């Protein structure tokens, strides 16, 4: 029996709701999608709950689920994945945080949680922090530049805990929070104290940085604080190949996703021009996926632009991103050959563009196979048509479904 290559494409934050600017259509409905439409006659579509109905997924928990790992068992917090994706080498017991370069006033009140989002000087600021803040109370501190305004912070040493609260207030106009222990332990208390010392030291370094003085002179907001959240102890995950028997690779420019994929043992590629934002080079990502499909059984292609547009409330940009993803799908199918692969297209969660945040809505999902199946006979691929389809699954079902339709699944039982 022929075994097919597997291509999984995730448009981050794909799912949506009717949008007033689109006369009640969703962005997926409004988008022109000729390549996807061409696949429908040999496809099943439907809805996926990344975690379970009504649960609002993070991008971390949803991807774990989609890759076949129950987040209730394996999730330890986002910080470790962000750090791995940003290039950190972690060892058991390290505590990692995800963070934002942000702008605060002299009273540490947050003015901009993302310091304007685009931060070309991020590498310079990370280098300066690593040179000037190396250790606090015998605990080693390391900073790693992530995508755009994002940064990861890793603590290494004895007697530290991830059971501490965030310093990120999550809203502008609020003061940077004091980290507090989340359990009654010496380790949690010690770690919270270290984080609070770190917050003040980071502000002192960044507020006097020549980089930020230049930004102010150029009319830009200074990146003068790092807001921390998502503390996580590093605990190694099983490799993707160990439970799927697949040789796997991933294309992504987003630190979190790269971190998860690296931890799962996938070969992670970030092509030149891939940014993890709206301005990403879609063609470069398509070419990378095509090359990886030559040598791998499974290729995962992650595109962040849909989610970035949603969080910023950019309706037209989300529609354009979907249309560009459709071209990516067409390019890959034309080059690899529609008879040689199965293709799944979905989102890791819904981010309604008028809400600007993740929601617990189910996400539309499409599965194309190159051989005769009972297709769903739908006119389009969108949230409304998906309700007519045959698929009604959880994220945890995705990997098994892909193994089955690629003729790679093993029988369960005698």
From Swiss-Prot:
Protein task: Catalyzes the interconversion of 2-phosphoglycerate and 3-phosphoglycerate.
Pathway connected to this protein: Carbohydrate degradation; glycolysis; pyruvate from D-glyceraldehyde 3-phosphate: step 3/5
Coiled-coil annotated residue ranges, if any: none
Family, similarity comment: Belongs to the BPG-independent phosphoglycerate mutase family. A-PGAM subfamily.
MF terms in GO: metal ion binding; phosphoglycerate mutase activity
SUPFAM superfamilies: Alkaline phosphatase-like
Uppermost EC category: isomerase
Catalytic activities: (2R)-2-phosphoglycerate = (2R)-3-phosphoglycerate
Annotated keywords: Glycolysis, Isomerase
Listed GO biological process terms: glycolytic process
Entry-linked PANTHER family: COFACTOR-INDEPENDENT PHOSPHOGLYCERATE MUTASE, METALLOENZYME DOMAIN-CONTAINING PROTEIN
Protein name, per record: 2,3-bisphosphoglycerate-independent phosphoglycerate mutase
Protein EC: 5.4.2.12
Source organism per UniProt: Saccharolobus islandicus (strain L.S.2.15 / Lassen #1)
NCBIfam families in the record: apgM, PRK04024.1
Keyword Cell inner membrane on entry: no
Entry-linked Pfam families: Metalloenzyme, PhosphMutase
């Amino acid at each position: 029996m022929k075994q097919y290559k597997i291509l999984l494409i995730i448009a981050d934050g794909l799912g949506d709701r009717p949008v007033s600017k689109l006369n009640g259509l969703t962005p997926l409905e409004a988008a022109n999608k000729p390549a996807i439409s061409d696949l429908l006659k040999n496809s099943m579509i439907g809805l996926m709950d990344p975690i379970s109905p009504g649960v609002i997924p993070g991008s971390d928990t949803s991807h774990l689920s989609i890759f076949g790992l129950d987040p209730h068992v394996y999730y330890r917090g986002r910080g470790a994945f962000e750090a791995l994706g940003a290039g950190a080498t972690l060892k058991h017991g390290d505590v990692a945080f995800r963070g934002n370069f942000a702008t605060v006033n002299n009273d540490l009140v947050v003015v901009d949680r993302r310091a304007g989002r685009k931060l070309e000087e991020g590498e310079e600021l990370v280098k300066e922090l690593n040179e000037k803040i190396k250790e606090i109370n015998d605990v080693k501190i390391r900073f790693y530049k992530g995508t755009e305004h994002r940064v990861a912070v890793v603590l290494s040493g004895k007697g530290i805990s991830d059971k501490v609260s965030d310093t990120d207030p999550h809203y502008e106009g609020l003061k940077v929070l004091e980290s507090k222990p989340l359990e009654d332990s010496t380790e949690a208390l010690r770690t919270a104290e270290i984080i609070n010392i770190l917050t003040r030291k980071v502000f002192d370094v960044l507020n006097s940085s020549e980089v930020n003085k230049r930004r102010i002179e150029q009319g830009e907001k200074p990146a003068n604080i790092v807001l921390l959240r998502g503390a996580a102890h590093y605990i190694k995950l099983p490799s993707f190949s160990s439970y799927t028997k697949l040789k796997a690779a991933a294309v992504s420019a987003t630190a979190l996703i790269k971190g998860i994929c690296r931890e799962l043992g996938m070969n992670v590629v970030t092509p030149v021009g891939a940014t993890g934002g709206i301005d990403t080079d879609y063609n470069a990502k398509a070419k990378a996926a095509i090359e990886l499909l030559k040598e791998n059984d499974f290729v995962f292609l992650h595109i962040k632009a849909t989610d970035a547009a949603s969080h910023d409330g950019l309706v037209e940009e989300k529609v354009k991103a979907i249309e560009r993803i459709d071209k990516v799908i067409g390019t890959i199918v034309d080059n690899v050959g529609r008879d040689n692969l199965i293709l799944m297209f979905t989102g890791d969660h819904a981010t309604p563009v008028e809400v600007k945040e993740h929601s617990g809505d189910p996400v539309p999902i499409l599965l194309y196979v190159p051989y005769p199946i009972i297709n769903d006979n739908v006119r389009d691929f969108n949230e409304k048509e998906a309700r007519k389809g045959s698929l009604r699954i959880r994220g945890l079902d995705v990997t098994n479904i892909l193994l089955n339709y690629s003729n790679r699944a093993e029988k369960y039982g005698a």
